[in-house]
UniProtKB/Swiss-Prot annotation:
Cofactor, how bound (note): Binds 2 Zn(2+) ions per subunit.
Family of this protein: Belongs to the peptidase M28 family. M28E subfamily.
Cofactor entry: Zn(2+)
Residues carrying covalently attached carbohydrate according to the record: N111, N184, N304
Protein keywords: Aminopeptidase, Disulfide bond, Glycoprotein, Hydrolase, Metal-binding, Protease, Secreted, Signal, Zinc, Zymogen
GO BP: proteolysis
Residues noted as binding Zn(2+) 2 in the record, renumbered to the chain: D211, E250, H359
Record's protein name: Leucine aminopeptidase 1
Signal peptide: 1-18
Organism listed in the record: Neurospora crassa (strain ATCC 24698 / 74-OR23-1A / CBS 708.71 / DSM 1257 / FGSC 987)
């Protein structure tokens, strides 16, 4: 069956544009007179894991078809060994019984800025796509690294705090910013920087405002304000804090798998990992008559870390949380979990009310709430600061209420 350009666009573009496409169909307007741009074809096979032990080999087109149907997965083609290097006996994760740093955090929380997040997100979404194999995806990563380094320099922290690319073969690199503490015990805050249009990833625009531009700028803002603490930039805190911006999450958690494979091989002591993926969309929650809240993922996460994050939300956020589920391999925290590290994930809402514009040309800033993103930034900043000063050695020995 031959399909016209206009008919194909009706499938590719947001529903809001469908009326224009229908009119073009009636008038036989050729929107692509030279033909629909073709996605580069590849016969390469990729090994994916859809659930524990459920693997198959697929083409790249089949990967995107699975994603369009809502199926998430690890692409384990190059990372089949993730989770096999850490042979230490299982040790139950332990976290503080309650938040203890509110006095020091209160002045910092007041410095979080919606304007900073909006300015960064406006530029970040101006790249045609942040698809991890694209040139604009590479450029967006370079731009983001510069913002992170500029943030460090503006804080006067460039003698101690570092930011670097974690390089990948596909061109768009992940980014790791490190705030050294007194010990090598590490707390990780993550988001993914790439975007995708699941119809023609190499061709169509993917502004990715919510997925995951919102998470990217949310943790960048938490990072900026965290560096306003003299104790933090002087390294007076116990634990090393890392902020990660992962490449190629949309391709099957590729960037985070590469990083956590390296960490697992090196026996890095990661105490906690929190992922922020989609932090700005609340419309469907409110339309359903539900209370604005943040969504705490409760499947395929560390329950003790998740309970601690709930306490952080209650203590430091102005809105409540709701428990929700997102399935296997639904974001980069899954890579940390697979490596044996306690991980957690907080999203913008109950999963069923999350943003329905993602992976299209219509994932735009106009649908987002920066007030809601501010709540995620408050949680992220408080999480980082509280665990920066946690004495995990004492906690793991069962001493004290730290």
């Amino acid at each position: 069956m031959k399909i016209s350009n206009a008919s194909l666009l009706a499938l590719l573009l947001p529903a809001a544009s469908a009326r224009f496409v229908e009119q073009a169909e009636q008038n036989r307007v050729m929107l692509f007179p030279d033909g629909i741009p073709e996605e580069p074809k590849s016969t390469t096979k990729y090994h994916i894991e859809l659930s524990p032990g459920d693997t198959r080999w697929v083409t790249e087109d089949e990967k995107w078809e699975l994603r369009r149907n809502g199926q998430r997965f690890f692409d384990i083609t190059d990372h089949a060994e993730l989770g096999t290097f850490n042979k230490r006996p299982y040790k139950k994760s332990v976290f503080p019984k309650k938040p203890t740093q509110k006095k020091d955090l209160e002045p910092l929380l007041k410095n979080l800025s919606k304007t900073e997040m909006e300015d960064h997100l406006t530029t970040f979404t101006s790249f045609h796509t942040r698809y991890y194999k694209s040139e604009s995806g590479r450029q967006s990563s370079e731009w983001l690294l510069k913002q992170v380094r500029d943030t460090i320099k503006a804080a006067g922290a460039d003698d101690t705090v570092t930011a670097r690319h974690f390089e990948h073969a596909w061109g768009q690199n992940s980014i790791i910013a490190t705030i050294p503490g007194k010990t090598n015990a590490t707390v990780v805050i993550g988001a993914h920087q790439d975007s995708i249009n699941l119809w023609l990833p190499s061709v169509l625009a993917a502004p990715g405002a919510d997925d995951d531009g919102s998470g990217t700028v949310t943790i960048l803002e938490a990072f900026r304000v965290l560096l306003q603490s003299e104790d933090i930039i002087k390294g007076n805190h116990e634990n090393t804090i890392e902020f990660h911006w992962y490449s190629a999450e949309e391709g099957g958690l590729l960037g985070s798998q590469a990083i956590f494979t390296t960490y697992e091989k090196a026996r890095r002591d990661v105490k906690a990992m929190l992922q922020q993926d989609m932090t700005g969309f609340v419309s469907r929650t409110l339309q359903a008559g539900e209370v604005e809240s943040v969504g705490v993922i409760v499947d395929y996460v560390d329950p003790n870390l998740t309970d601690f994050i709930k306490k952080i939300i209650v203590e430091y956020c102005d809105i409540p949380y709701v428990e929700t589920k997102c399935g296997y391999a639904c974001s980069d925290h899954a890579s940390a979990s697979k490596a044996g590290y306690p991980s957690a994930f907080v999203i913008e809402s109950a999963f069923e009310y999350s943003d329905n514009h993602i992976h299209t040309t219509d994932d735009l800033i106009k649908y987002l709430s920066f007030d809601h993103m501010l709540q995620h930034a408050r949680m992220t900043l408080a999480f980082a600061y509280e665990l920066a000063f946690a004495d995990f050695a004492k906690l793991e020995k069962g001493h004290g209420d730290l």
